[in-house]
């Protein structure tokens, strides 16, 4: 029988682990978004419809970053459908989960939720059917102060006048 020996030195550091490795994601699967972090009209929710109990737990866990939309939902996600007044957002078939997505929780709500949860934002983009131009347009919407098509769209649709400063996009 061969023997092996290992020495562990708790003071020997090879590098720092990026805190974002401990991040998470949220997607419209089951009750993860609707009823999980967002529930309009519930006594458990704040004035924006965000579940206060969930926000408190996410802050307590110190989740460093959350990707939205996570999982398979991104395969049919059109971020443009998820911005602006909720009553004007189109309802679309969500083919991955076989439901109708009303887009009441979208990009703008996620950005607000992330601020309240004290976590960073990572947006996922649908490169499978939409391509890299979608990522460029999303960055323009989120990060430009104004004077461009998508930044002016943000300024005309919602209360977020300052850019989000979106730094990370996943594909």
Language-model-detected regions and their locations in the chain:
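Active-site-adjacent substrate/metal-binding segments within catalytic domains
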Residues: 19-125
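Conserved helix-loop functional segments at active or binding sites
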Residues: 97-99, 144-148
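Single conserved hydrophobic/aromatic residue that forms the stacking wall/gate
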Residues: 158-171
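Short mixed-charge
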Residues: 146-161
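N-terminal module-boundary/linker segments of secreted carbohydrate-active enzymes
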Residues: 2-14
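Carboxylate/His-rich catalytic cores and anion/metal-binding grooves
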Residues: 61-70, 129-146
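Short strand-loop junctions, especially beta-strand C-caps/beta-turns
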Residues: 11, 124-128
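Surface-exposed acidic, glycine-flexible loop patches that form ligand/cofactor-binding
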Residues: 13-15, 56-57, 112-113, 157, ...
